[in-house]
């Protein structure tokens, strides 16, 4: 079991992270809609940067990125494993702006969903397979034409660390149809 120090730091992170998230979510609701796209991404990601900083300071999380040279400016499809909330946050900082394919229910979450909606994600109803694929292909093509990278978690939901789920083909199909690289 985790030590008491780890437990206390984890609870402290959770409390601070959520308190700042509520305040920032309200600010996003009041200010974010009026900002141009690039400023909106930077504004929303203030909370993300804070969360990554807090993880490092409070919980000792260190980040090392290998292969950053493979990331380019402009349109591409990023296919990523989904093991926790962490990678969704960090990818927002690593590649911004971006359009993330996500389940629409995330946008219904108070505060968090309000900020997320400002990033113009590709919303899908995971219960409707064909309609979800159509949304990814159509909305993804629009974002790519605008020069915005698209992030897809092809397993559809979180997987246990070290395991791989079934990869849906929407990301590769989107990249092939739009002749953009896959990272």
Residue ranges and their predicted role:
Residues 3-64, 114-118:
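A transmembrane-helix-recognition feature enriched in membrane-embedded lipid enzymes
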Residues 57-183:
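Soluble catalytic domains of membrane acyltransferases
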